[in-house]
Amino acid sequence: MDGRGILSEFANVRCHCGQVMNQLATMLEPVDAASCDQGEGGFLKGGADRFLVSDDLRVMPGLSSQCLMLLKNLSIMDAKELESQSMNIGPEEILQLLRSSLLSKTPLTHWIWLKQGASDLMELELNNMAESLDKTSATSDSKKMSLKLFISKSREQVLYAESGEDFADLLFSFLTFPLGSILKLLGGKSLLGCVDNLYGSVKDLSTDNYLKSDELKNMLLCPKLAPFFACENQLLHVEESSSPQYLLYSNGKPNNKWFVRPLTTESNVSSLGEGLGPLSMVNPKSSTGETTGGGGYVKGPAKFMVTDALVVTQLSPISSISFLGKLDVPITDVDEKVVQVGEEEALNLLKAALISETALTDVFNLTDKSVLE
């Protein structure tokens, strides 16, 4: 916090004047009842019927017709084949289900196997998914960034890429994307376990009977980035949430403690006294106390080495030669190729990052001989 109307959640941040912000303040919860209530409960309406969840995580209304259709699709004609089990679900089970939903096409079955002490077979499924990687086309033109590929001619495989900070920022920005936004970008076809089915289930459930509102439905289907998570080199269009403004309070006592809380319609009414402000949050990617978005995650200018499996390290002549030695690739087998990365390539990189261990090779399609020439 400083006297120029800005605050930061991080230590040693500099304000506009260049000085380190060193006044501590305690963050308080908002007092607006509406904003507090919005975070309570779930996405589904209270009193709604039970739901039917299939093994591949399709969520459907718990109607008899849906149940019979599911059994028919599974070729189960005799009800005597069915067995009922009750399962307790705690934090450990939720984590297992989350992991299974990302990697397995039958996560509920896999979860039961794990509960019974079976071995984890999901790695094989992940490899099979990578083999069926499909390309995703962009919907509009976008800016481009250059990337130099170093290719093994004999293996027709990308060994590594040489990039500037723009491409490194692009890759790191993938880590900030909400899962729902990733599925939206990929058109609900991520090939990632069963999450595509979950995404489709939310689309199919109506706000008349099941989901609480269109706003909450949109929150699941099109979640926004957290404030300041977007970067200047982000080729993919994911909307960023706006950063709230804050009010500053003093307890009016000799020790003079300071408090801040998000600015809402009721924030000026507080037992702490009259609020001062507004204050704006500093963009953590800014070195000069800016409160606007943008910026990048890595320092520039710099060069980075990106492996086929998307391991990003600082580039140096020694590191690249050492890496070729580890791969046992002779220098005479290495060719160079400069490619352009736009929205379409960024979409395919995002998809490959989720399901492939050879992302660069898969995206830039080295079976196309024009890339190797």
Each predicted region: which residue ranges?
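Long, position-biased, composition-driven segments near the start of the mature protein
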Residues: 1-373
